[in-house]
Amino acid sequence: MKKIEAIIKPFKLDEVKDALVEIGIGGMTVTEVKGFGQQKGHTEIYRGTEYVIDFLPKVKIEVVVRDEDVEKVVETIVKTAQTGRVGDGKIFIIPVEDVIRIRTGERGEQAI
């Protein structure tokens, strides 16, 4: 099993969620996050004063899937989240040792 963490632009969340549901992903965790990468931040002017905004708002989607579903999920996220502009985000793929469904005690892929 693998955990896929995708950091994407917030306005792409609904499109990515719908695409993941369409390919059979039954659950995900979504967190509002802030960060910066190569694009760094940007400058804004508020009431005549210039401010540097270092951390940009992003959304983190976390999904745990079977090994055989990883590429399909990654391709779906890339296809739907990509704008072609700086700041589109990143995807991380992390090994998952076990999953336990708290309600039933099920373990492994049955608990996904």
Swiss-Prot record:
It holds the Pfam family P-II. Keywords: Nucleotide-binding, Phosphoprotein, Transcription, Transcription regulation. One of its GO terms (molecular function) is enzyme regulator activity. The keyword Lipoprotein does not apply. SUPFAM superfamilies: GlnB-like (SSF54913). Gene3D superfamilies: 3.30.70.120. The modification O-UMP-tyrosine is found at residue 51. One of its GO terms (biological process) is regulation of nitrogen utilization. Belongs to the P(II) protein family. Homotrimer. This is Nitrogen regulatory protein P-II. It comes from Aquifex aeolicus (strain VF5). The gene is glnB.
